[in-house]
């Protein structure tokens, strides 16, 4: 260990990169976000269980699910602008505080043995809105706490964290709900508090991201810039639209499986275990996502993922046993996590730093916004035609998406569009040193960010 310019650095070989654990700010960002995600997962799943078990109404459960996913449609674009204008660390801290207070109101109402669907839906909306701001800020900050060559590894580590939390959070939430309805919400409050304490220690950015020319722009103009940036990249926008369709399908599958378990007399904990199986599959998928991203082009990953989903999803129509559903969720989540790692790395790598929030918000609007429509539509579809026919519908939609992905990404010109869109933004010029020589900005960043 040595000290240069006030920064503690580890001695390493000429070509070796330090591990991600060597970066203090990345460790704190990862840990604080892990607790925040765990809190959101515990309360998010408990919202649906609470309404479904208390009212017995699939449409009410779908309404709460819609409220929790609606911010993906309404909040994404304004949030992207604000993330590019404000200090991202402070945005994250504010989001944690607001979510903590909102979820605490549910815990208090349950301690008083009171449940209102409108209250649960409102808190679900507030929590999800703050989660949008938080996720955009966190993803943008990753680029500032690790060097460019380790961005893919950092994204894979973050996705593995989220999938691992899904694996743990869903069964824990289901088990706590089985013991007492207020327990998942009170646990979320405690986790949010721990997340806040961790984020306070994060150095973060001293100022908001620089804006070219320092020109003041209105929000509508800033949103238009982000939309135009995505729309001008043919391959990028096509991939996003197809993934948006698959997200709509998966949201419908999740709600349908919950109803299947309840119809068959299963407990809330059974749903948690099925979701945990998906979390385990996602964890393994995230771990191999970086490896896959280095060996396959994005268009090849898209075809592989959608064809596999189309082949395995119809199994839910014929096999209702919890073990079979758990295996299905393991496979679909494994592939989904690998696609997510590749997609996030792709987007962050090609997007300029001062546009990370806006471009990320457009991506999340297209990819996750469709999920809100999936939750709402599936709730009413279930009441109209039942679980079996609903599963047939969502499976059929996935088959269509697989055919579209195969046709679009194997056509002449698809490879050229992929290469054009994936060209990274200009890299910074070498840093001038007093003796007249220059330094590689990557090396400079590594030395500045490492704290043993």
Where are these regions (language model features)?
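Hydrophobic alpha-helical transmembrane segments
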Residues: 117-128, 150-210, 269-272, 276-280, ...
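C-terminal transmembrane bundle of multi-pass solute transporters/carriers
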Residues: 74, 78, 85, 89-91, ...
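Helix-loop boundary and gating motifs at the non-cytosolic
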Residues: 11-71, 228-278
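Hydrophobic core of transmembrane alpha-helices in multi-pass small-molecule transporters
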Residues: 34, 115-133, 244, 324-338
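Transmembrane alpha-helix termini and helix-breaking/packing motifs in multi-pass membrane transporters
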Residues: 48-55, 106-112, 168-187, 259-264, ...
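Transmembrane alpha-helical cores of Major Facilitator Superfamily
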Residues: 34, 66-70, 97, 156-164, ...
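Intracellular juxtamembrane helix-capping segments at the cytosolic ends
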Residues: 47, 133-146, 338-351
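Juxtamembrane intracellular "pre-TM" segments in multi-pass secondary transporters
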Residues: 3-27, 205-241, 424-430
């Amino acid at each position: 260990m040595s000290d240069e310019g006030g920064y503690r650095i580890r001695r390493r070989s000429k070509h070796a990169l330090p591990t991600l654990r060597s970066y203090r700010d990345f460790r704190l960002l990862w840990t604080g976000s892990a607790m925040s995600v765990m809190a959101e997962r515990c309360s998010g799943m408990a919202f649906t269980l609470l309404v479904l078990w208390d009212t017995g109404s699939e449409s009410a459960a779908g309404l709460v699910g819609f409220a929790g996913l609606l911010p993906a449609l309404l909040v994404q674009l304004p949030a992207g602008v604000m993330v590019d204008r404000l200090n991202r660390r402070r945005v994250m801290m504010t989001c944690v505080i607001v979510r903590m207070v909102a979820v605490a109101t549910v815990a208090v109402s349950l301690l008083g043995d009171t449940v209102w669907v409108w209250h649960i839906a409102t808190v679900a909306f507030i929590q999800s809105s703050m989660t949008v701001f938080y996720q955009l800020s966190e993803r943008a900050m990753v680029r500032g706490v690790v060097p460019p060559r380790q961005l893919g590894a950092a994204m894979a580590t973050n996705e593995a964290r989220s999938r691992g939390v899904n694996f743990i959070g869903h069964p824990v939430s289901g088990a706590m709900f089985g013991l007492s309805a207020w327990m998942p919400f009170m646990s979320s409050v405690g986790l949010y508090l721990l997340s806040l304490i961790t984020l306070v220690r994060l150095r973060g950015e001293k100022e908001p991201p620089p804006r070219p020319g320092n020109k003041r722009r209105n929000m509508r103009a800033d949103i238009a810039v982000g939309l135009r940036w995505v729309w001008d990249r043919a391959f990028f926008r096509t991939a996003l639209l197809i993934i948006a369709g698959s997200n709509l399908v998966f949201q419908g599958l999740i709600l349908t499986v919950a109803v299947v378990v309840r119809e068959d007399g299963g407990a809330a904990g059974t749903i948690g275990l099925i979701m945990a199986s998906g979390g385990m599959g996602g964890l393994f998928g995230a771990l191999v996502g970086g490896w896959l991203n280095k060996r396959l082009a994005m268009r090849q990953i898209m075809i592989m993922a959608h064809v596999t989903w189309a082949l395995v999803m119809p199994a839910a129509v014929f096999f209702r046993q919890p073990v079979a559903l758990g295996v299905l969720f393991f496979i679909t989540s494994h592939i989904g996590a690998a696609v997510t790692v590749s997609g996030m790395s792709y987007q962050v790598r090609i997007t300029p730093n001062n546009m990370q929030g806006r471009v990320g918000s457009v991506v999340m609007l297209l990819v996750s916004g469709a999920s809100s429509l999936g939750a709402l539509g599936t709730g009413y579809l279930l009441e109209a035609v039942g679980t079996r026919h609903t599963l047939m519908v969502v499976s059929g939609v996935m088959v269509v998406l697989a055919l579209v992905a195969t046709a679009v990404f194997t056509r002449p010109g698809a490879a050229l569009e992929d290469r054009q869109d994936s060209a990274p933004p200009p890299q910074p010029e070498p840093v001038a040193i007093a003796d007249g020589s220059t330094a590689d900005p990557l090396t400079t960043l590594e030395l500045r960010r490492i704290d043993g």
